[in-house]
Amino acid sequence: MDDETAAIVIDNGSGMCKAGFAGDDAPRAVFPSLIGRPRHHGIIVGMGQKDSYVGDEAQSKRGVLSLHYPIEHGIVNNWDDMEKIWHHTYFNELRVASEEHPVLLTEAPINPKSNREKMTQIMFETFNVPAFYVSIQAVLSLYASGRTTGIVLDSGDGVTHVVPIYEGFSMPHAIARMDLAGRDLTEYLVRILAERGHSFTTSAEHEIVRDIKERLCYVALDFEQELETAAKSSSIEKSYELPDGQVIAIGNERFRAPEALFQPSLLGIEQGGIHETTFNSIQKCDVDVRKDLYGNIVMSGGTTLYPGIADRLHKELVNLSPSSMKIKTIAPPERKYSVWIGGSILASLSTFQQMWISKQEYDESGPSIVHRKCF
């Protein structure tokens, strides 16, 4: 497929937007899904100040902006801002006309139906796309890993979900979703850093904490053991330089923040950790397929990038599951973008071409057609 006619794949994450052309092996544009609005009035005339900034530009000017993520927990809470992000994707990042390319969007499972309908409506009515499809993120991650059977643990910035898939069929009754993901871990890290006397309050300072989290955090294989080690020696302490040059030391916070994935009670969330959620999801599946699911636990999304997370998940599942069960956790190196890569594979398949919702079908049936044609 050439760029003239190739479908466009946009993976709208709560934290990052990944966009590019179907058939490519990586997204061309990756930028934070955020909108920044000035906190102060501009006084220098003729500087061409805008009333809002998108993505990297908002990130670089964050010192004077208040930042807002339009997607929270995988659900769009501000459609005007969402439109700005899509506009930015088409016209500034990919530099293509939206009416010339079919578009594939992604979504978290168990999302409100209205979210899909509105997405469909904006794409057809505002951007005039010729064809449209929306796909479940975890399913795409499985495509990207080259499997048709497996259970995908996809954890991004806004949503963590577990989707079991057998021979290409998803099992909707066993899908589990947790609204506990990267952004909650960032908030938690903000809180435990405050105990050390480092206060991060503004939306811009939260971005600094997110960077600390991405660079320094890891998952402990044995949490209690690691806490003892941390108390005895300073071997796990790392220093981090803040943008103003001040250096702060980060100790047991490095593994305390991601621990919330396995112990959501740390955040006051009454729910099992990702290991229990995965286990429960497998238990809801038919007894004949469980063995295949245990042997293909595929991780995807940015929140699965912590060092040590695959080993810890493996250990926890071994403790939960029957003793004879062979458990394999697969953490592909490109898992940060595997949803996008799966979308790129799907949209370039010849068999997929009859699956698109065309403009004509949309005009006949309205936004509700998305529930019939996309599952």
Swiss-Prot record:
<dbReference type="InterPro" id="IPR043129">
    <property type="entry name" value="ATPase_NBD"/>
</dbReference>
<keyword id="KW-0067">ATP-binding</keyword>
<comment type="similarity">
    <text>Belongs to the actin family.</text>
</comment>
<dbReference type="GO" id="GO:0005737">
    <property type="term" value="C:cytoplasm"/>
</dbReference>
<protein>
    <recommendedName>
        <fullName>Actin</fullName>
        <ecNumber>3.6.4.-</ecNumber>
    </recommendedName>
</protein>
<dbReference type="InterPro" id="IPR004001">
    <property type="entry name" value="Actin_CS"/>
</dbReference>
<keyword id="KW-0547">Nucleotide-binding</keyword>
<dbReference type="InterPro" id="IPR004000">
    <property type="entry name" value="Actin"/>
</dbReference>
<dbReference type="Pfam" id="PF00022">
    <property type="entry name" value="Actin"/>
</dbReference>
<keyword id="KW-0206">Cytoskeleton</keyword>
<keyword id="KW-0963">Cytoplasm</keyword>
<dbReference type="InterPro" id="IPR020902">
    <property type="entry name" value="Actin/actin-like_CS"/>
</dbReference>
<dbReference type="GO" id="GO:0005856">
    <property type="term" value="C:cytoskeleton"/>
</dbReference>
<comment type="function">
    <text>Actins are highly conserved proteins that are involved in various types of cell motility and are ubiquitously expressed in all eukaryotic cells.</text>
</comment>
<keyword id="KW-0378">Hydrolase</keyword>
<dbReference type="GO" id="GO:0016787">
    <property type="term" value="F:hydrolase activity"/>
</dbReference>
<dbReference type="GO" id="GO:0005524">
    <property type="term" value="F:ATP binding"/>
</dbReference>
